[in-house]
Amino acid sequence: MSSKSELESLLNKIVKSNDETEVSKALKEIEDNNEYIEKKQLRSLLTMHDKKFKDQCLIPMNNLYVKYNDIVGKDRNLQNETAFVDRDIRVLESTLQYIIENKNSHNTNHGGCNKTKNSSKDKLLDK
């Protein structure tokens, strides 16, 4: 039993020792270097990369946005106007088709007896 208590006392002496060893000196130096790297170098590196990112990417992209935003807005308006024109053309085509169908059904119902000389309207509708 004395060897066990002797072993425990030696272990406590090593663990609670205030004497610096080569390993403890190296560990302290590593911890100090790590703290310096995290607090000083890493922050300055992040700041440098943030500035580089802003200068090379963000600012040019913002300049492009400012330069071409009005053009895109005009194109958007042009697309809306095109949609309106397309809709109007479809309405006119449908109306013309209904007129032609109505004319054909009217001529069929009356046997075509009321047909007069081809007027300009009839020529347009025949096309």
From Swiss-Prot:
<comment type="similarity">
    <text>Belongs to the BLOC1S1 family.</text>
</comment>
<keyword id="KW-0967">Endosome</keyword>
<dbReference type="GO" id="GO:0032880">
    <property type="term" value="P:regulation of protein localization"/>
</dbReference>
<dbReference type="GO" id="GO:0031083">
    <property type="term" value="C:BLOC-1 complex"/>
</dbReference>
<dbReference type="GO" id="GO:0007032">
    <property type="term" value="P:endosome organization"/>
</dbReference>
<feature type="region of interest" description="Disordered">
    <location>
        <begin position="103"/>
        <end position="127"/>
    </location>
</feature>
<comment type="subunit">
    <text>Component of the biogenesis of lysosome-related organelles complex-1 (BLOC-1).</text>
</comment>
<dbReference type="GO" id="GO:0005768">
    <property type="term" value="C:endosome"/>
</dbReference>
<feature type="compositionally biased region" description="Polar residues">
    <location>
        <begin position="105"/>
        <end position="117"/>
    </location>
</feature>
<protein>
    <recommendedName>
        <fullName>Biogenesis of lysosome-related organelles complex 1 subunit BLS1</fullName>
    </recommendedName>
</protein>
<comment type="function">
    <text>Component of the biogenesis of lysosome-related organelles complex-1 (BLOC-1), a complex involved in endosomal cargo sorting.</text>
</comment>
<keyword id="KW-0813">Transport</keyword>
